[in-house]
Amino acid sequence: MNRQRLLAVILIAIMIPLSGCVSDGIDGAQGEQGPQGLPGINGTNGMDGIDGFDGINGTDGQDGMDGQNGINGKSAMISTFDVLPGIHCENGGIGILVGIDENGNGMLTSNEVQETTFVCNGIDGVDNSNSSVSGSTSNGLLNAVSKLGYSDGCPAGGKVMMFGLDNGDNGGIANNGLLESGEIDEQTTYCSTQRISRVTDIAPDALNSNPGGPIVNGYVGMQIVVDDTLYFSADDGIHGTELWAYDMTTDTTRMVADIYPGSNASYPGYWLVLEYEDVIYFDASDPTYGRELWAHNTVDGSTWLVANLNENQYGSNPGDDIEIVYGDTLYFSAFTIDYATEMWAHRPANNSTWLVEDIHHGSSSNPGWFMHFVYEEVLYFSARDMMNVHDLWAHNQSNGTTWKVASFGMAPWTNPGNYFEYLVGDVLYFDADNDLNGRELMAYNLQTNTHWVVEDIVPGQTSSNPGIHFSLLVGDIIYFDTDEQYLYAHSTSNHSTWMVHEFTGATPQNSVKPVVVGSEFFIKLEDGNANLELWVHNTENHSTWMVQSFTAPPSTSTLDIGTIEVVNEILYFDAITEDYGRELWAYNPLDGSTWLIANIHKADAAAGTPDGSSWPGFSLSLVHNGYYFFSATDNAYGVELWKMWFEHTVTYD
């Protein structure tokens, strides 16, 4: 092959692969996408930036509201008792109880004791031939306890516990069994003082809330304690007189319910106030039903109408004559158009209410108006039937029967229990007018169904009116006054009756119930000058005397008012004087001392008015767990709820 042909062949071979690039042919179809490649390696993190500057602090927020005050602390207490020879002390001694006064009554009760310690007497020493006292204990440990009163610097009472050896120190006599003053080595003094304060200001400023009142038109107000809460009527100046509550644990006061809306008053508890299984039952008035039976649950706070017995706006006045819890049922009188005033019943378990018995057809039997009581699971009560005479009736809850038990006279004024009744064993003692003897002391034996005149104090048909102002049962003796201003007594044991005292120029008052402290009872008498004074009778030595004469301002009448309460054997009562007006006073039978507790209604210097009267306990007076709650008025707050409590101090010498 010549050289030119060879070059042409080589040139053609080179040009053949390039023919697609240099030619302008149509593109071929795109091939499928290949699989994704593996991720690349992460790059290196960058360096952190420089921190910014701190911002300026914000302004402080406003302070929060103060929390409620904490509950007052409780006092530690010690009490002692004699220990007879036995398991704790072979030769006897004293026991020492230590605990916290949880209920604040100034006394250590069994459930408050946390520790008990015994200090035992030593054994008798061996007789010494040189001793003048044979068989005596050699310098034994002795103890003595003395009560303290106002004159000892303990206005609310106290006691001193003394310990020492019977060694004759400081001029004493050794081994005589008496702890003499010179032998006292140690002593502990417990002393209590009264403190009073206003609980709250329910009605703003000087308006009167009248707790437990007001005392108008026969309304004496409502006051009852359930589980350390005091329930009472009061008027805040906005809602009228309604039901209020004071919680003694949290020291707070609240209105329970506004039963009569607006400024009108429901006057709760006008006739009836009963408590059953944490529910308070009471009468109250509203614009729809009038005065009917209501209830308040002290646990869940609910209040509701129990029953609308009289289908008109005036209501049924439940409890006008009788109110009592008998078994699991409330029994009370009520007025209806169909039956007039008869006995009704309400059973909370099934919320049922029914008429017990229509005793006086077409009119009112007024059940329980004069007396009612439960004896051997039967309810006894006074009532009148068609003869219009009040007799003794009975109702048995178990079988639902009602019957007349006994009649004591034929006149409409027989009225058994008009002034008092006392059940002693199987015998009922009461006053009644039997037509022959006038109104005298009578008795009825519920077992033998017999009755008799106990004593015809004023012979003939003239009445002595036993208990016309006051009466009380002390032990087995009934004390009562008579129309002629005598104090009488009747022993239910030996059946004797005698005149105890003649109140010359003084008249007992039925507005203040007598109280008993130890062997003495206290009453209030009008001294002939319209002044009420405190009197006392000792049932052991049979003496009667006036505690103290209080000089009242001229032209001041104090009749049918007043109160007497007892806390830890000390009497608290109202008295009026020229210096202070009517204020709260105290009397301690231990040392016979009388003193002013507080001048609550002080003079207003700005107005130039003298001391007024605070009228303590006028509308509310109640003692609970060592506290005394009472109504009182002052210049700044009007009539409000007050309380008295006690501070205790312990001194070791």
Task: Map each language-model feature to its residues.
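Collagen/collagen-like triple-helix recognition
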Residues: V22-E102, M107-Q194
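Cysteine-centered, disulfide-bonded loop motifs in secreted/extracellular proteins
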Residues: M15-I16, C89, C154, L243, ...
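Short, functionally important structural connectors and interaction interfaces within domains
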Residues: A8-A13, N105, M222, N449
